[in-house]
Amino acid sequence: MSSSSSSSDDEMMKTFFIMGAAVVEEEEQGKDSTSVQHKRRIVLHRYRLEGHNRLFQDYFADTPTYPLHYFRRRFRISRSLFLRIHDAVVEHDKYFVQKRNGAGQLGLSSLQKITAAMRMLAYGASADAVDDYVRIGKSTSLESVKRFVRSIINIFGEEYLRSPTNEDVARLLEEGSQRGFPGMLGSIDCMHWVWKNCPTAWQGMYTGHFHEPTIILEAVASKDLWIWHAFFGLPGSHNDLNVLHRSPVFAQLAEGRASPCNYTVNAHEYNMGYYLADGIYPEWSTLVKTIPASRGNKHKYFAQQQESARKDVERAFGVLQARFAIVRGPGRFWQPSVLKDIMTACIIMHNMIVEDERDCQLDNNFDFNDSIPVVEPSHVQTLKGSIDED
């Protein structure tokens, strides 16, 4: 009798085990099906055609809803210059050409993609912020920005980031002579751009006196705010002097390919121009600095005039940040190469605006987002750091 009871107990245990395994399997299947449901992509009908028609009627129609000065204020550039950039970018990169998708639906127009890119550059807005008006998704906005800035560099970089030609040098020399600095070709300084999404492993290298990761821009600008030289990409642990030693600003002069620069001061002939700089820069013949703790009227007057003219590059930094708020606030992209493309493209378009509005007196004061911190030019000496190439 004991053997029969033990066998029945074994059968019962097997039954319970099979039932338990079945319950566990059903729960796992339920979890899998639930997770699949949560991962399904939500398709939004953004009514792209209506978005394009509204955008076209607002700004690009023969009789637009908003006049030209509204366009200039909101896009940071004139409509004629925008259309010039638009046509060149569409011709250069077929990504911006309107196409149909696999389902036969008409995609975004070139105006929508380029407008989204310009709004992100001009306002420093997130990719999702332009969706409700332009009717463009976040991932498409990010891709449009990356392709747009790369197209700007490839199309206009050679012309609008060129070294001064003979005609440019003659005009700069005349301009400097009128300001009391014969031989001056511009002023040089550095600016830091905060990198919000700097990888943790790199933060020590990119952190300097700002106490947060930054990337340095070295620039040379003239009185009309044209940026003649831009060197971007060194970590923020460097100072202006470290950047200068790695910069190609004097590369053409060292190779003997610089444009001729002849002028006379106190009956002495000179054939090499110079830049105005602040006190951290070295005592080179191509750099003219102020006189610290100046004594006497002559020295005080020279220091005052030098410090006044040297602010051209700081004004250029301020106008660049006003026109393109994306370089005023912290950089949110992950790759240094993308940040470099954005900075370079903004400088190119800044120079295009300077050329387009050279004879116009326009207000460059734009409404800023108070939540975006101000990026100040660098004037403090910091520790040396290693260089990280893109």
Over which residues does each language-model region extend?
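Charged, often Cys/His-bearing segments associated with DNA-binding zinc-finger transcription factors
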Residues: M1-R100, G157, D363, T382-D390
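Short basic-aromatic helix/loop recognition motifs at nucleic-acid
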Residues: R73-R76, N101-L108, M118, F232
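Structural recognition of short helix-loop-helix hairpins that underlie histone-fold modules
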Residues: H86-A103, G124-S126, Q321-G331
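Short, conserved non-catalytic motifs in the polymerase core
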Residues: V97-L108, N297-F302
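Short, amphipathic alpha-helical "recognition" segments used to contact nucleic acids or chromatin
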Residues: S110-A122
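Short, well-ordered secondary-structure "scaffold" segments embedded in the functional core
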Residues: A127-A129, Y133-D390
